[in-house]
Regions:
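Sequence-structural signature of mature extracellular/luminal beta-sheet repeat domains
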Residues: 1-233
Length: 233
């Protein structure tokens, strides 16, 4: 979990580890304004710094080593099923990063006032939330060629994303004026608020079927019995 702080703020610890029992431990303080976390298919941990425009790789000694640079306001990170990294610059660019950290612009979408959140769906498309100041924000869907379309429209400030094994998409967002976790059907035709909450920014599923929901200052565990997807198999 990241503790990003305000832009340029120096914090003694910016990454934390929460185990399955809910115990919190300090992990690393080497990265300023960390925002996105993703694990590669071989289990390596990568973290973006929105201050520096850099994605770092955490080595076994919990030291941060720069992996990719020149990524603008680097926020969300995701790996496709082939293990290729994608990084969202909230000013409007999605970068594709090769295995040695070289970046190239993959596609452009509208900028965000907060952060890009990225997740690959069961169709191998990249799904992106990019919150703005409207109440009709969209979830972008980007195919393997970098072509974009709107998967769903009508959310307020959508942020963290996660898929379940049935292809449903879960988003920390507001729907019809109510804030919480929204479930969007696999075909994008229907959306429903399944858990209410304010100031929610992210979510993830555990192997036990629990949903971890993150607010600006807390982490909650919901026993929803939903199996999620995390890494390519």
């Amino acid at each position: 979990m990241t503790r990003s702080g305000s832009r340029g703020e120096e914090l003694p610890v910016t990454l934390f580890r929460i185990d399955i029992s809910g115990d919190v431990s300090e992990y690393s303080g080497d990265i300023s304004n960390p925002t996105g976390i993703a694990f590669s298919p071989d289990g390596q941990m990568f973290v973006s710094s929105r201050l520096e425009g850099v994605v770092y790789r955490l080595n076994p000694f919990k030291e941060a080593v720069a992996f990719a640079r020149n990524l603008g306001v680097a926020t969300g990170i995701a790996f496709d099923p082939q293990g290729v990294m994608y990084v969202g610059d909230r000013t409007g660019t999605i970068f594709r990063i090769n295995g040695i950290g070289e970046e190239r612009t993959w596609t452009q979408i509208e900028p965000s006032v907060s952060a890009f959140h990225l997740a690959f769906g069961p169709d191998d498309s990249l799904y992106v939330s990019a919150p703005t100041v409207t109440s009709f924000d969209v979830i972008w869907r980007i195919n393997r060629d970098g072509d974009t379309d709107i998967f769903f429209k009508g959310l307020g400030r959508p942020q963290g994303l996660a898929f379940d094994r049935d292809g449903n998409l879960y988003v920390a967002a507001a729907l019809r004026g109510r804030r919480g976790i929204v479930r969007i059907s696999a075909d994008g035709s229907d959306a429903k608020l399944i858990a209410a909450g304010v100031n929610l920014v992210g979510l993830a599923f555990s192997a036990a079927g629990e949903m971890a929901v993150v607010s600006i200052d807390s982490v909650y565990s919901l026993p929803v019995q939903i199996k999620g997807t995390l890494l390519p198999e």
